[in-house]
Amino acid sequence: MSDIVSISSARPRLLVSVRGPDEALTALRAGADLIDAKDPERGALGALPPETVRAIVAGVGGRAVTSAVAGDGTGREIAAAIATIAATGVDFIKIAVGGADDAALAEAAAQAPGRVIGVLFAEDDVAEDGPARLAAAGFVGAMIDTRGKSGTTLTSLMAAPQLAAFVAGCRTHGLMSGLAGSLGLGDIPVLARLDPDYLGFRGGLCRASDRRQALDGARVAQAVEAMRAGPRADAA
């Protein structure tokens, strides 16, 4: 695991989803803050094989924070998947939480204490008490993402006040927060104003803006530059 894990930052940090060690190095060299392992061919929360996650973590070598998708199953299935991915040495493990009850959430978080992040989908009705429930269950963070990956963006599904309330709820309950969902470089100024811990990208930083194609190091570098510049005063 990385020695530089942090759940807070002066401004949003850049999460880049990668599908293998080569892309992880591309993202790392371009300045990404968090390297997120997932399979873009399998939707929003497609899990990679544990050996691939392990290779990504080894390649990053503690130079950035790492996360990996465990999947979007439920019950014993997801509990076992969390334990398996946790054993790779990745810093954080992401799972879909959907309509899971409090007992199921607590069971999931207990598989890797202090390392599980719950993912909520923008297409669903994201409950206001989501951050509070995840914190009570033992999760370390919460993210909003889009389930569909056909180009519909987070900002077209949820208004800025809704996203701001989610980020504020995470902060109130001590959770790391993240926003993702078919984001492009143009979304950074607006979403950065909401001050989440992370903004997550995949397709917008790939060749031809196609999440199934290879990660483009130049685009990652542009995203890093935009993140470091901070939100524009006119980006309301």
UniProtKB/Swiss-Prot annotation:
<dbReference type="InterPro" id="IPR007565">
    <property type="entry name" value="4HFCP_synth"/>
</dbReference>
<comment type="function">
    <text>Catalyzes the formation of 4-(hydroxymethyl)-2-furancarboxaldehyde phosphate (4-HFC-P) from two molecules of glyceraldehyde-3-P (GA-3-P).</text>
</comment>
<protein>
    <recommendedName>
        <fullName>Putative (5-formylfuran-3-yl)methyl phosphate synthase</fullName>
        <ecNumber>4.2.3.153</ecNumber>
    </recommendedName>
</protein>
<keyword id="KW-0704">Schiff base</keyword>
<dbReference type="Pfam" id="PF04476">
    <property type="entry name" value="4HFCP_synth"/>
</dbReference>
<keyword id="KW-0456">Lyase</keyword>
<dbReference type="GO" id="GO:0016829">
    <property type="term" value="F:lyase activity"/>
</dbReference>
<feature type="active site" description="Schiff-base intermediate with substrate">
    <location>
        <position position="38"/>
    </location>
</feature>
<comment type="similarity">
    <text>Belongs to the MfnB family.</text>
</comment>
<feature type="active site" description="Proton acceptor">
    <location>
        <position position="94"/>
    </location>
</feature>
